[in-house]
Amino acid sequence: MATRTVETSDSRQTEALGAELAAALSPGDVVLVQGELGAGKTTLVRGAARALGVTDPVTSPTFSIGHRYRGRDVTVSHLDLYRLAGLHEEEPELLEDYLGPDRIAFVEWPEQRSPELRDARLLVTLTHQGGEHRRIEVCERERLPGDASLELSG
């Protein structure tokens, strides 16, 4: 697995990193986004969604569990599993609605450990460093030859 660590000093930089990550994603990809409350998870997803052509407001799905947004060429799913023990336990149909081969999914609070998330493309961990500063670690799982890959050296 390739890993990259980035330091950001404001929300614009965090959104820019999300946009950079989005450029390497394809329909069917799942990105796990973890970090404490207020770490910038939704900010990162907002940047990715904008880069994928989403024009609607991108907000935290904490109270609704998930949002779907229409991008230029792909639907973007944004799930928050904070209140769920697992996708199948609460609402099994969420898998079909939010995780599918025709969409890109971002899943906040993946610590809830749903087995359906084991094939996720990326794990992104955000950590507060004081003020607006964040340390963001991006871990890419192995890809097959010919798949788009991120430049994670640095």
Please place each PLM-identified region on the residue numbering.
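N-terminal pre-Walker A segment at the start of P-loop NTPase domains
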Residues: 2-17
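Short phosphate-coordinating micro-motif centered on Lys-Gly-acidic
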Residues: 2-4, 88-90, 94-154
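Phosphate-binding P-loop
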Residues: 23-27
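P-loop (Walker A) phosphate-binding loop of NTP-binding proteins
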Residues: 36
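Conserved lysine of the Walker
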Residues: 41
